[in-house]
């Protein structure tokens, strides 16, 4: 059974926003589910262009600390600690941290 330990996890820092993405799911395990932890700096913004896909990708965002705004297409949701948003990745998505405190959230993706 694959296990992901803290020392084995990889992370990536976006040079533009300072956002840190850490892969939580065990690497090299064939699963349709991925878990990622994100540390999102105060004042940061990250946008993803998503459109029509061959297969459906679902994502849930669960805020652990702080607050963020998520815009999917033209709809914006404000999320605080312990809020969880479920969405299909079929439209552009923008994440914003409009506060003066870093936010931390968990992303669960299923494809």
Predicted regions and their residues:
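Short C-terminal boundary/hinge segments that cap the last helix of small helical domains
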Residues: 1-2
